[in-house]
Amino acid sequence: LYAAGNHLFVTEDEGNSWKMISPDLTTNDKAKQASSGGPITQDNTSVEYYCTIFTTTESSLEKDLLWSGSDDGLIHVSKDGGANWENVTPKDCPQWMMWNCVETDPVKKGTAYFAGTRYKLDDFAPYIYKTEDYGKTWKKIVTGIPSLHFTRAIRADRKKPGILYAGTE
């Protein structure tokens, strides 16, 4: 079981103990980490705090392959169970992408899909990126999704290789 903040944690004993398995996988931009709410009461939901890992997954095909995406635009991959991490954020990705969902391909090694959004920046375009080489290169794949339907989720069909499902608003 994994849990995340700005670091990724894992438990192997049903939550009795946790081990941090990553460095900070966000931009750690202090300007984005201010307390939210008004001058009298603070917001205690933490929904306005940023620099947080929003999505993470482990590969069902490759042992020790982990992916993470943050709400401040970064994508990281680890091929050794979290001992080492590489920033593989797509070069053509707009700044401050909120990565909402990551999915590994059920049959192709090294392949992952990330769904992101920038609606909080008044950008309602869909953003889905695919890599087939562990994040070395990326391709934006949004053909067929209306231009103002921002993306929240991406899932690969486990029975029909090559079929993807996108969750949009």
What function would you assign to each model-found segment?
Residues 1-169:
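Beta-propeller blade termini and top-face loops
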